[in-house]
Swiss-Prot record:
Function: Transfers the gamma-phosphate of ATP to the 4'-position of a tetraacyldisaccharide 1-phosphate intermediate (termed DS-1-P) to form tetraacyldisaccharide 1,4'-bis-phosphate (lipid IVA).
HAMAP family the UniProt entry points to: LpxK
Gene Ontology MF annotations: ATP binding; tetraacyldisaccharide 4'-kinase activity
Protein name per its UniProtKB record: Tetraacyldisaccharide 4'-kinase
Keyword Transferase: yes
Record-listed E.C. numbers: 2.7.1.130
Keywords, alphabetical: ATP-binding, Kinase, Lipid A biosynthesis, Lipid biosynthesis, Lipid metabolism, Nucleotide-binding, Transferase
High-level lineage: Bacteria, Pseudomonadati, Pseudomonadota, Alphaproteobacteria, Hyphomicrobiales
Amino acid sequence: MRAPAFWWRRPGVASALLSPIGAVVGAVALARMGKAGGRVDAPVLCIGNPTVGGAGKTPTAIALLDRLTARGATPFALLRGHGGSAPMPLRVDPAIHGADAVGDEALLLARHAPTIVAGGARLAGAAMAVETGASHIVMDDGFQNPSLHKDVSVLVVDGMVGVGNACVTPAGPLRAPLLPQLARADAVLVVGDGSAGDRVAAEATQAGCTVLRGWLVPDPAAVAALHGIPLIAFAGIGRPEKFFATLEREGLALLARHAFADHHPFRPAEIARLVEAARAQGARLVTTEKDRARLTGPAFAGPEFSGVLDAIAPLPVTLALDAPHALDALVDRAEARFQARRT
């Protein structure tokens, strides 16, 4: 499902009609968030977001995993494994698991650190990570889930859209009322520029959160390889238009754009149509790393896709922070709290 357009406008008739349901959803979410979570013998750092959909959580989790590794730690990634069908909890092996089994984010995270997909059993997944050598656990999503105690929580916000109309789903994009979420967070990371993100940053500051600023930076080599080539772009992420705008900002030539819902499970027939359209126009297909990761598994293992998927270019992005030592400060805080709860 794609987010309704009215979520990103000032509250109107649609959000007003849905607000009673949003009030119930918000109350239930806050009641769940107030429950004590189970604890494991490792610091837990959670990367979540206050809204439904993507805002840059996975690149943030990757940046944190890489920083922990550079510090000499052995971090594990922990996530639900959205769309995965394999029995969970499960340690991801990219050599045998496709996105159909473990979800797209898990395959990306597993390139940087050992990764556990846990389904709804995050506490069991965290325990598995610790038993197999995790010194730290980085949760990709799960801020609103109470099952696992978090030593540090970071909320990631898209600077362009912020929290939209600031209403709780289905009246708006929020998973729960904003201020109580900020009260449970240690930091808010605003990714990208925009007045909507600035407003969230101001509220986060008033709530006592550390405010960080960051940007998703496309891989220069990948961009250079696509210059001068006609492109057809497709994406099934929280805001596909954000991906398309990135391509245009980098000076790439887009002939067409195809937007799909977040975590869209691509069917072979859909990809075949895109491939044929690209061939007919002498273009190359380009997509996000997440979307490219979903083009794995038995559905895309047939001979008709031999060599075809290699021609679909992913555009990797990395998180750049305005404060170089921000991640170290978060890790230090998590480790201090972990030591305090052990004594």
